[in-house]
């Protein structure tokens, strides 16, 4: 089991290497606008999961996933050339759901804001039922 700090450094290095290689371009027309968001490496440094997002439609996401799967070997050899680890970790690409989750959270926050505005509007014109405040009674001095 490797030191967690070493695993994190290796993950950061893999993220940079893969992102730079994708920035230089692959010869695959299916590859869309890809952003590498994170890399997680197992404790034994044997496997790396590369999380990515794709800007575009569902079809472009599927095409990009196929292109990354096809280019896994080439990207792994690129990683192997640029790291100092004894063994090169296997790469697995996983679509990151951050944009979809963020949009869902933004929608929920908008709904909550709208509901708060509606409640505040109803509270402005509201009055207590009965007296001003039926629970507050003046104290009598003995």
UniProtKB/Swiss-Prot annotation:
Compartments it resides in? Cytoplasm
Cysteines paired by S-S bonds: none
Does this UniProt record's set of keywords contain Calcium? no
Gene3D superfamilies reported for this sequence:
3.30.300.20
Is Cytoplasm one of the keywords UniProt gives this record? yes
Q: Which InterPro entries match?
A: KH_dom-like_a/b, RbfA, RbfA_dom_sf
List the Pfam families: RBFA
Molecular function (GO) terms for this protein are: ribosomal small subunit binding
Principal place where this protein is found?
Answer: cytoplasm
One GO CC annotation, please?
cytosol
Keywords (alphabetical) are: Cytoplasm, Ribosome biogenesis
Q: Name one GO biological process term.
A: maturation of SSU-rRNA
- Subunit structure of this entry? Monomer. Binds 30S ribosomal subunits, but not 50S ribosomal subunits or 70S ribosomes.
The record's function comment reads:
One of several proteins that assist in the late maturation steps of the functional core of the 30S ribosomal subunit. Associates with free 30S ribosomal subunits (but not with 30S subunits that are part of 70S ribosomes or polysomes). Required for efficient processing of 16S rRNA. May interact with the 5'-terminal helix region of 16S rRNA.
HAMAP family referenced in this protein's UniProt entry, alphabetically? RbfA
Q: What's this protein's family per the entry?
A: Belongs to the RbfA family.
Put simply, this protein is called Ribosome-binding factor A
